[in-house]
Regions:
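Short, compositionally biased
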Residues: 98-120
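Glycine- and charge-enriched low-complexity intrinsically disordered segments
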Residues: 116-157
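Structural motif
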Residues: 84-85, 98
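Short, positionally conserved secondary-structure boundary motifs
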Residues: 1-82, 109, 143, 151-157
Length: 157
């Protein structure tokens, strides 16, 4: 009976170690407050939670350079649904046509397809709703790229 208990205990310990090692590669990616996917909305700097991601599985080299933003609106619904989490890589440049988190006027952020030509910045929605219009800014409006959209996590209700 003592031997049987030792075997049982050993199995439980081994299983626990295996479970821990299976999850040891997870990165707890921060989730920042909601972001507008319509007209730019106030940029929130608060972390509202964290979502575990497996950087290796997702092909992410530096997970600490990533964060999630909760999408609020329908202007990008062909790409990402309202309420979903947009995975963003922190970077200050993107190629024309890529989707970016853009800070407009220093205090409002939006998720849009980004294009820059000369001194003109174009932020374009990608929506099934024609109500959303392209936003065009000249050099008098401060524009700063906060990051590039690289993926999403959608919660099915």
């Amino acid at each position: 009976t003592d031997i049987m208990n030792d075997v049982t205990n050993l199995s439980i310990i081994d299983l626990a170690k295996e479970s821990i090692s299976m999850y040891s590669n997870l990165y707890m990616c921060p989730v920042y407050g909601r972001i507008a996917a319509g007209q730019p909305n106030w940029a929130e700097e608060c972390i509202e939670g964290r979502i575990p991601i497996d950087p290796e599985l997702m092909g992410i080299v530096n997970p600490e350079e990533h964060f999630f933003l909760r999408v609020n609106g329908e202007s990008m619904n062909n790409v990402i649904k309202n309420g979903a989490f947009a995975l963003i890589h922190k970077q200050d440049t993107v190629k024309n046509g890529e989707i970016a988190v853009v800070l407009v006027n220093g205090d409002t952020a939006t998720l849009k397809r980004f294009t820059k030509k000369d001194d003109i910045v174009v932020l374009e929605p990608d929506s099934s709703d024609s109500e959303f219009k392209t936003q065009i800014y000249d050099k008098t409006t401060p524009i700063r790229i906060l990051g590039k959209y690289v993926g999403k996590m959608e919660i099915n209700n």
